Amino acid sequence: MYLKEKPDGPFVTLVSFFRVVASPHGRGHALVLLEAPLLHRSLPEALNVCVTDNDALAHYLVDNFVSCFGAFKGAEALAHMDYVPLEGVAASGDTRSAYMEWVKGRNVEVSLSWEDLGQPFLVNIPKEKSATGQHALHSLFVDARRVTATVNGRALKGKPVPREFAGRQSSTAFLAYSETWVKM
């Protein structure tokens, strides 16, 4: 979820959730949440955190992928976020209408909901055109026209806006299923 208050404004909330089954650092989960992407601080001024059950994996994802994603470029908070131990994670919903993720870490409880889902579409992006420039990307994407993101019961700012992605009109709020990055 990459959210803005105005389509031509800056991103005000950035969220990326990973459920990883294979990596150089094993399995794990990582929720990168920047509620103040341009702030070069985290707690207590802003909830700029990575909630994870595998620190090595989380740092690998942030350093090699998240920091390369267009919405996260220039997000000073990324370098200053706190890494918080994961205490629980659960998914619910389906891929046709609504999907939810719940993540709990020390002093952080996050609920993410993607609704009004579009038709799934397959993406195959060669390394030369990928965010990292080093990996080919293969994934099934599903756009969401509406999202809800709450932290500790408080709604996060922003809403999804239209974007161009992989040669088609898309949204800044989406699900990426079976996302596979292959180093070339």
Locate predicted features.
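Targeting-peptide/extracellular-domain and disordered-appendage signature
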Residues: 1-184
